[in-house]
Amino acid sequence: MSENTKVEAKRVFIGAGCNRVVNNVSWGASGLVSFGAQNAVAVFCPKTAQILTTLPGHKASVNCTHWLPTSKFAFKAKKLDRQYLLSGDSDGIIILWELSTLNNDWRHVLQLPLSHKKGVTCITAYMVSETDAMFASASSDGVVNVWDVSFPSQPSEECKVVCLDSICVDTKAIVTLSLAELPQNPGRFALALGGLDNKIKLYSGERTGKFTSVCELKGHTDWIRSLDFSLPLHTTEEIPNSIMLVSSSQDKVIRIWKLVLVGDVGSWRREITLASYIEGPVFVSGTFTYQISVESVLIGHEDWVYSVEWQPPVIDFIDGRLVNHQPLSILSASMDKTMMIWRPEKKTGVWVNVVCVGELSHCALGFYGGHWSPNSLSILAHGYGGAFHLWRNVSSSKESENWQMQKVPSGHFAAVTDVTWARTGEYLLSVSQDQTTRVFSAWKNDEGNEAEDEHWHELARPQVHGHDINCVAMVQGKGNHRFVSGAEEKVVRVFEAPLSFLKTLNHTCAGGEGSFPEDLQADVQVLGANMSALGLSQKPIYLHSSSEPLERNGGGEGLDTFETVPEAAPAELKEPPIEDQLAFHTLWPESHKLYGHGNELFSLCSDHKGNLVASSCKAQSASMAEIWLWEVGTWKAVGRLQSHSLTVTHLEFSYDDTLLLSVSRDRHFSVFSIQRTDNGEVSHKLMAKVEAHKRIIWACSWNPFGHQFATSSRDKTVKIWSVENDARIKQILVLPPFGSSVTAVAWTGLDRNEKSGCVAVGMESGLIELSNVKIIETEEGTTATAALALRLEPFMCHVSAVNRLAWRPTEKCESNQSLRWLTSCGDDNCVRVFNFKF
């Protein structure tokens, strides 16, 4: 196949949630935020609430990320045109990445040698200068490695990373670290370690030597979850002589420790008395003596405190000098669903929480981490549900604070199993093993509504379920927006868009074109949906429902029931919703349940007229591998198609709805003829069953312009087939072998007259390729030619297996016949949207 270089690709959108682990998020001096999304390292811009890229390299789930420099050292990054990012995974691998701030290009610099044998739990760093840094990494096997890194001063140079020391603490895991330079002792550092033994271990060492244990700090009564050193504290003295360490624990308590320079070793030993040790441990580093003592104990959180972080330094005048001043301000994040900002009172010096923000949703399950922005005007939290929460201080006065929630990127926090477009492309719908169904759409910006001004956001969360969701299909045809979903259960569930969603859709880029007019909206009597605490069904909230009296459940006293769950408040949204709204107020009501399958659902599809839905389930026998046909509207079973002996992995109707194609784990595909009689009954007939591949067939797709289709398989091949006039199935083309198992395929039409189209191929490696395919029909039969159109760059593709590809319906491309939109989903928790110019 020759390569056609005329196809231009643009990545439009990435939706992903954060891995549910502590230390996973880092806010860099560049203003960008990094986090782990399965085995990808994702980077997003808080200003636009858009994920900019994902970095491929890790094979295991990413546990932690850390910028060099972070927001704490933003004052040392003003002149840097390159910044760096560290990421560690559950296999113990640490990778160093480079960002060119001039053109926003990313580069894989190196994978650290001698990485950990078990999962990396934490990475911390200290910027010695603009071109030098130290960092430490901890592992669940109790080993802490200390590294020295030198950044290149010239573009032609490379980073130099040296392992200074490897500290074997004990068999218990170390889960948090913090690194700081000792006051008035250049080149000597303090390293604080926290883990599962409730103690803070303090080590001291040089950039060129080993680190030795100097003392232990006791006080916490449960696991230490977070540690953070402050920068040197400026006082009336010219040179600061103290730093602070803040620690948090599962005992719900935050402790502040003060590390003070006592003096040089000789003078201190002359003055040593028993009283010298009352305030706290004393240790020697080099020629200086230090003492560390408890400064304050902060009690306010009601659950485990997972994260504490000092506010980044601010430029301030102290004694007529312009210095980077360390504010006495701490941000804490807890599993009690709150973040707090702690500061000492000016008069008494007593530490109090001056700001408290958090989640009010009953669906919320607490925060794993909290982070300051470089300018300290924003704070970011990430939680158990993989979601981000961003607050910004919008107050114009320095005397008061007004923290308001801001837009953030969102997405699934587990593998995304299926994705589909709305019937005319207004939005896309994805389902995941995180047990949610999500709607993504482009929102209009203030600048305009052209493609360049579109920002994609999560529009709604129609289904929040109790089982992993495997498949989804939009019901095509006229009428309200409807979809069917199948999960790790035997029931197909049908959902219908409520009025609140239809009105919200008018504010999106695509929905404003009147895809569901006002006069049709008047027929929709359901405003939204409620979710019961102990059930899986989502009950409708009617537009004019009468509220029942509170006494229906004994005044609300007694045992908890489904009636104690707060009522959802669905409403028209004029801007992208925040997490609290998405989690509970954007549900779609469930209208029907379809019973029949004997095992968990695996695949669904709808015909293009909106008359039929086909479904399949997991199967190890021919009786279980039946394909069920359901009539839209009555939702009755109108057919049970038998052909396969193992799980049917994918289903698709031809574009004229006369044929149904199925592919299976049994390495066969089947083509069924679907006909409607004059009285509306559905008849079906097996036309052909062909053993098409040597391994499991994962996906199939029809040519929009004819009865040709593509199949993709674990045998790394994609084959093109044609249904001939005499009902024979003929293989007309085999694309050259791919680099890994082909898990997804999708065909879009480009030119009906020339019968040309484009086949998108998604692989287990995460890569995506496009091939131009042209169908040639003659009297002798059908043939086809193909040419490689484009191989997407790895930085644009998924980092794990691609599970589904879907082209946007071509009705949305009529204004620009050369533009096509493709969405994809994968095991890296990501939903992606691309556009291609042919």
UniProtKB/Swiss-Prot annotation:
Disulfide bridges in this chain: none
WD repeats: 17-56, 57-107, 115-157, 174-213, 219-267, 300-352, 361-401, 411-450, 464-505, 596-640, 643-682, 692-731, 737-781, 797-835
Alphabetized UniProt keyword annotations: Abscisic acid signaling pathway, Cytoplasm, Nucleus, Plant defense, Repeat, tRNA processing, WD repeat
GO process terms (BP): abscisic acid-activated signaling pathway; defense response; negative regulation of anthocyanin metabolic process; positive regulation of cell population proliferation; positive regulation of defense response; regulation of leaf development; response to abscisic acid; response to oxidative stress
Annotated knockout phenotype: Narrow leaves and reduced root growth that results from a decreased cell division rate. Increased abscisic acid (ABA) sensitivity and drought tolerance. Higher resistance to oxidative stress mediated by methyl viologen (MV) that blocks electron transport during photosynthesis and by CsCl in light. Accumulates anthocyanins. Reduced defense gene induction kinetics and salicylic acid (SA) accumulation mediated by pathogens (e.g. Pseudomonas syringae pv. maculicola) accompanied by an enhanced susceptibility in npr1 deficient plants.
Pathway(s): tRNA modification; 5-methoxycarbonylmethyl-2-thiouridine-tRNA biosynthesis
GO CC list: cytoplasm; elongator holoenzyme complex; nucleus
Predominant location: cytoplasm
Tissues/organs with expression: Expressed in leaves, stems, roots, flowers, siliques and guard cells.
Localisation: Cytoplasm; Nucleus
Source species, domain of life: Eukaryota
Pfam family, one: WD40
Purpose of the protein: Component of the elongator complex which is required for multiple tRNA modifications, including mcm5U (5-methoxycarbonylmethyl uridine), mcm5s2U (5-methoxycarbonylmethyl-2-thiouridine), and ncm5U (5-carbamoylmethyl uridine). The elongator complex catalyzes formation of carboxymethyluridine in the wobble base at position 34 in tRNAs. Promotes organ development by modulating cell division rate. Prevents abscisic acid (ABA) signaling leading to stomatal closure and seedling growth inhibition. Involved in oxidative stress signaling. Prevents anthocyanin accumulation.
Annotated family: Belongs to the WD repeat ELP2 family.
Record text on subunit structure and interactions: Component of the elongator complex which consists of ELP1/ELO2, ELP2, ELP3/ELO3, ELP4/ELO1, ELP5, and ELP6.
Swiss-Prot/TrEMBL domain comment: Folds into a two seven-bladed beta-propeller structure which is required for elongator complex assembly.
Name of the protein: Elongator complex protein 2
Organism of origin: Arabidopsis thaliana (Mouse-ear cress)
Lineage, top ranks: Eukaryota, Viridiplantae, Streptophyta, Embryophyta, Tracheophyta
